[in-house]
Amino acid sequence: MNALIREIEQAYMPKNFPEFRVGDTVRVHVKVKERNKERIQVFEGVVIRIKGSGTGKTFTVRKESYGVGIERIFPFACPSIDKVEVTKRGKVRRAKLYYLRERRGKAARIREIKEWEIRKRAEESKAAKENQ
């Protein structure tokens, strides 16, 4: 039964999402319908949590605008999401970054992982798997 549910859910899951984790800064392009027009609105912020699995999987993005913190929850299987871009990779040691809610400005910064570090780690893990 579980395999059947998982197979049905796979049909509804989007396949064009990039790989991102908690702590990454993402830019989410959302389709917004206003009367008879449809436009794309961009929401950029830090992923503070990823929750759930299957079609119920969601991620929460937090940004600060004019000194006010704004959080928005996006389902992975949402047809109104046009695309998701990862702008920065963050290095965090927590699965949920709720502590960012109390922090403002520079205190809310997250250490960034550079692209060459990501490639180096991928090569090292690939080499380790080949040696086993």
Curated annotation (Swiss-Prot):
Gene Ontology CC annotations of this record: cytosolic large ribosomal subunit
Assigned keywords, A-Z: Ribonucleoprotein, Ribosomal protein
GO molecular function ontology, one term from the record: structural constituent of ribosome
KW Ribosomal protein (keyword) present: yes
Keyword Ribosomal protein applies: yes
GO biological process: translation
Gene3D superfamilies: 2.30.30.790
Role, per record: This protein is located at the 30S-50S ribosomal subunit interface and may play a role in the structure and function of the aminoacyl-tRNA binding site.
PANTHER family, A to Z: LARGE RIBOSOMAL SUBUNIT PROTEIN BL19M, RIBOSOMAL PROTEIN L19
Family: Belongs to the bacterial ribosomal protein bL19 family.
Protein name: Large ribosomal subunit protein bL19
